[in-house]
Structures are given as structure tokens and as C-alpha cells.
Design a protein with these regions (language model features):
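Short coil/turn connectors at secondary-structure junctions
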Residues: 1, 40-42, 48, 52, ...
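Divalent metal-coordination and catalytic microenvironments
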Residues: 8, 23, 28, 49, ...
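Conserved residues at the C-terminal ends of beta-strands
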Residues: 11, 92, 152
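Short, glycine/charged-enriched secondary-structure capping and boundary segments
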Residues: 19, 39, 70-74, 103-106, ...
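Metal-associated gating/positioning segment near the N- to mid-region
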Residues: 47-112
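Histidine/acidic-residue-rich, glycine-tolerant segments that coordinate divalent metal ions
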Residues: 95-107, 111-152
């Protein structure tokens, strides 16, 4: 599929890019230069007045899964994130049970692997059960896949 995004402000801090120009996407891959004309595009998006940016990262989300799924699941949280332009999220450990052991980290990552394509990078708890008493095994949590620790 060929998509042309026109009239947007392209922003990419990693490339020091801040320009008003078109963006061409072919089969899900951004093209470096004009790859096709507007009449060859399957879809044309007018981004006038908007920004076109790389995927956003939310370092502090509350998915509440496992244990409090009636508030938010990993799937619904990922869908909401994707709709908002986020490609990566870091769910806080304040779930039931909290993300304080490798088994819970694995559960979160397993659920995230079948969600909507948003990268989920779990945050581990600082203390067991988030009770502020016994420290978690941060090395084991890191090995399981956490990217940070928090008591939130």
C-alpha cells in the first residue's frame, strides 16, 4: 500500500529534522525520497496544521493488568496508546499482584506480545508487594524484562 502524507510538519529530533514537507510510505516503510506521485498513492493524508513524528514513548502508564482488568487491560491500553501515536509504553508495577517477580513480568510480556503492536516495556516494583519493606530482586526482574523500577 502506498500512502502519501502531505502538508505536515516533519519532526525527528534524532535527525535534527524540522521541515514542512511530504512523507511517502510504501508497504509500511517510510521512503527516503519521493517514491511515487499523489495519483499513484492508495491513500493521501492531509496533515495540514499537524505534526508528523516518530512513534511516541509514554514512560508512565497504568494498565492495571494483571489483577485489576476492570480498570484497564494490556490490550485496551495498547489500543489507546496506538490511537494516540504511541509506539512504546512503560506500565507501572501497581497491579495485583504487583510486578515484583519474574513470573509477573513474563505474564505482562506474554499478554503484550499478542496486543496491537505497541512495544510494552514493564516497570518493576522496588519492594515486594509495593509495601516498602523487602526489596525485590531487581537483577532477576531485569533479566525477566523490566526497564526501570518504581513504587508507583
Amino acid at each position: 500500500m502506498r500512502i502519501l502524507v502531505e502538508n505536515g510538519r516533519l519532526l525527528d529530533p534524532s535527525r535534527e529534522l524540522d521541515v514542512q514537507e511530504s512523507l511517502w510510505i510504501e508497504d509500511g516503510i517510510i521512503c527516503e525520497k519521493q517514491a511515487f506521485s499523489a495519483n499513484q498513492a492508495d491513500r493521501v493524508i492531509d496533515a495540514a496544521g499537524g505534526w508528523v513524528v516518530p512513534g511516541l514513548i509514554d514512560l508512565h502508564v497504568h494498565f492495571r493488568d494483571p489483577g485489576l482488568e476492570y480498570k484497564e487491560t494490556i490490550e485496551t491500553g495498547c489500543l489507546a496508546a496506538a490511537h494516540g501515536g504511541y509506539t512504546t509504553v512503560c506500565p507501572m508495577p501497581n497491579t495485583k499482584p504487583s510486578t515484583d517477580c519474574p513470573e509477573v513480568v513474563k505474564e505482562v510480556l506474554d499478554k503484550a506480545s499478542v496486543a496491537c503492536g505497541v512495544h510494552v516495556l514493564p516497570v518493576g516494583a522496588v519492594t515486594v508487594g509495593q509495601k516498602g519493606e523487602q526489596p525485590t530482586d531487581v537483577a532477576a526482574l531485569k533479566e525477566a524484562g523490566i526497564v526501570a523500577i518504581s513504587e508507583d
